[in-house]
Amino acid sequence: MSAAEDTRSKTDDQLKDSLLELKKEQFNLRFQAASGQLENTARVRTVRREIARIKSVRGERNRAPQAK
């Protein structure tokens, strides 16, 4: 199962919680990068993409009832 399918299978509350958690992680990663303590630089990119994926799914769900 792809990451997008995993994200779509979550409920709205789970998506909200995941988004909040990822934003906190992104904040911490930004500070680690600024202070030179960041070891896994690829994690910044991964977190950013996961946030975008969640926002995309939430947008799809918001637009879906309007299309019908």
UniProtKB/Swiss-Prot annotation:
The Gene Ontology biological process terms listed for this entry are:
translation
Family annotation (InterPro entries): Ribosomal_protein_uL29, Ribosomal_uL29, Ribosomal_uL29_CS, Ribosomal_uL29_sf
Q: Would you say which domain of life the source belongs to?
A: Bacteria
Protein's UniProt keywords contain Cytoplasm: no
Name any GO cellular component annotation.
cytosolic large ribosomal subunit
Q: Which UniProt keywords apply?
A: Ribonucleoprotein, Ribosomal protein
Molecular functions per Gene Ontology: structural constituent of ribosome
Among its keywords, does the record have tRNA processing?
Answer: no
UniProt-listed NCBIfam families: L29 (TIGR00012)
Annotated family = Belongs to the universal ribosomal protein uL29 family.
Name this protein carries in UniProt = Large ribosomal subunit protein uL29
The species this protein was found in: Rhodospirillum rubrum (strain ATCC 11170 / ATH 1.1.1 / DSM 467 / LMG 4362 / NCIMB 8255 / S1)
Gene that codes for this? rpmC
